[in-house]
């Protein structure tokens, strides 16, 4: 247990940020999963819609520091390539 006031504050801040990051990461995974499921179902129109919705979520997660910018770029690139193979 923390003994200093500043350490107690840091613990609270960490818990708050962890919860916020967990929510962003969960949302991110959900949107990525929607794109992959649409691609697996060979539904090009749905996959394109899902990709268009997923890209801003991925970029937001990167700008908030939840994921690295390279990770965001890699995800967007791979998902775009996947959707483009559907035609």
Swiss-Prot record:
User: Which organism is this protein's natural source?
Assistant: Geotalea uraniireducens (strain Rf4) (Geobacter uraniireducens)
InterPro entries, per the entry: Ribosomal_bS20, Ribosomal_bS20_sf
SUPFAM superfamilies recorded: Ribosomal protein S20
Q: Which family does it belong to?
A: Belongs to the bacterial ribosomal protein bS20 family.
Q: Region Disordered: start and end of each range?
A: 1-23
By its UniProt entry, which Pfam families does this protein fall under? Ribosomal_S20p (PF01649)
Q: Note whether Protease occurs among the keywords.
A: no
Q: What is this protein called?
A: Small ribosomal subunit protein bS20
Which gene specifies this protein's sequence?
A: rpsT
């Amino acid at each position: 247990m923390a003994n200093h006031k500043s350490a107690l504050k840091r613990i609270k801040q960490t818990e708050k940020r962890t919860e916020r990051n967990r929510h962003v990461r969960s949302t991110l995974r959900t949107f990525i999963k929607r794109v992959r499921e649409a691609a697996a179902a060979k539904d090009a129109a749905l996959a394109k819609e899902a990709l268009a919705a997923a890209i801003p979520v991925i970029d937001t997660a990167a700008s908030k520091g939840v994921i690295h910018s390279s990770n965001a770029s890699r995800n967007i690139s791979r998902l775009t390539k996947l959707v483009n193979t559907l035609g």
